């Protein structure tokens, strides 16, 4: 979510991994009365949605899709694309720091088979949003781009369909939830473990659920979960400490997500410190459904996949959070009492080999997937470099939640 001038995107809760629902789950689809019009293919990487975009005829560039955010273009494209900057804004993110962003207009933006014209964008250094994430993104498309449409996201087909509101077939569209939009923030009423609240729906977040600090404090949620993993998430404005737990249920209208992986934020400033929101529902939850944002009609539709996608809400079994660098995987955090900590891996270490393979031959999504999806008891042999010395360690996965 990068909302209004609140610029944020969650990097990860430890290791967010790519997970594509089963491609044969096609008993549901985008609810339109007519043949598909504007169709935008996308990639799902690390539970982020990426589309291929052409800007003023140049590209293609990889843009992330955040229906709860504003439109952004990377600052590095301003000069080569001759974009005119007309003003500056100050934004806030998950942390306490402020960031600067410029204003510009993109005359032509091509996504899939659809062309947008004269769209307002902000310029921003997008490396701050997803540092070392293994995917170089050059822009973001958000709520202003989709405000005129019912926007359907089909995670199974990896397609976004822009539907004329008059052509939206509401009968088979699924469970309907009233939806509000303010400063590009899309919200619904939901409940976590029986506690109701107003939650943001955020396709810019790869996580299942993050609960804001005031909500956590008010309902004394930390004391309810003695079993947790302490970690951090980062983005614009710095990083935020959080406790990751497994809740009982997240209720969305008539639908329920059982045992959702949930981050309890510990923040004094930034988006996660907002008292007007209970929390943030991300793609880890949304990928269970065909999701239709009817912004003109102020409704959110959720159609569950049949059968349900596999491996939902499996959690990182290593305790590692890593980013990618040219020579390997840099250790960003090590959760206390986890296999990574017990193996002697430390923050700042560089993982140069994994099971005998150079880390440079393995993509970041692949290693994240391995560390989460391999069963408990699986052993990884890693070459770990501290300063100028390399040692071999054994990391044995186990269930942490």
PLM segments and residue spans:
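Pepsin/retropepsin-fold aspartyl endopeptidases
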Residues: 19-401
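N-terminal secretory signal peptides that target proteins for export/translocation
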Residues: 1-5
């Amino acid at each position: 979510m990068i909302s209004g001038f609140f610029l944020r995107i969650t990097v990860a809760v430890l290791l967010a991994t790519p997970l594509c629902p089963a491609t044969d789950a096609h008993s549901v689809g985008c609810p339109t009365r007519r043949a598909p019009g504007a169709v935008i293919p996308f990639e799902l990487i690390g539970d982020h949605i990426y589309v291929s975009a052409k800007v003023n005829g140049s590209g293609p560039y990889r843009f992330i899709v955040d229906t709860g955010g504003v439109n952004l273009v990377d600052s590095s494209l301003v000069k080569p694309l001759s974009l005119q900057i007309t003003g500056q804004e100050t934004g806030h993110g998950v942390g306490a720091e402020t960031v600067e962003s410029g204003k510009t207009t993109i005359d032509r933006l091509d996504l899939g088979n659809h062309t947008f014209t004269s769209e307002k964008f902000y310029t921003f250094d997008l490396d701050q949003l997803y540092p070392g994430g293994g995917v170089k993104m050059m822009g973001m498309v958000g709520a202003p781009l989709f405000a005129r449409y019912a926007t359907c996201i089909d995670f199974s087909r990896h397609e976004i369909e822009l539907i004329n509101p008059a052509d939206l077939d509401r009968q088979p569209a699924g469970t309907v939830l009233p939806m509000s939009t303010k400063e590009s923030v899309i919200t619904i009423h939901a409940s976590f473990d029986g506690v109701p609240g107003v939650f943001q729906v955020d396709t810019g977040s790869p996580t299942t659920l993050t609960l804001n600090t005031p909500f956590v404090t008010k309902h004394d949620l930390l004391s309810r979960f003695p079993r947790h993993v302490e970690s951090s998430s980062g983005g614009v404005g710095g990083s935020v400490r959080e406790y990751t737990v497994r809740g009982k249920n997240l209720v969305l209208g008539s639908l329920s997500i059982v045992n959702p992986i949930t981050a309890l934020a510990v923040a004094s400033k930034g988006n996660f410190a907002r008292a007007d929101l209970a929390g943030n529902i991300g793609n880890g939850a949304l990928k269970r459904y065909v999701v239709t944002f009817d912004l003109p009609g102020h409704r959110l539709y959720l159609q569950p996949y049949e059968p349900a996608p596999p491996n939902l809400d499996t959690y990182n079994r290593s305790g590692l959070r890593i980013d990618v660098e040219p020579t390997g995987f840099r250790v960003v955090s090590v959760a206390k009492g986890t296999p990574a900590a017990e193996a002697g891996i430390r923050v700042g270490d560089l993982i140069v080999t994994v099971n005998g393979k150079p880390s440079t031959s393995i993509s970041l999504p692949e290693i994240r997937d391995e560390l989460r999806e391999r069963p408990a008891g699986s052993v990884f042999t890693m070459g770990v470099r501290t300063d100028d010395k390399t040692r071999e360690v054994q990391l044995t996965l186990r269930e942490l939640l």
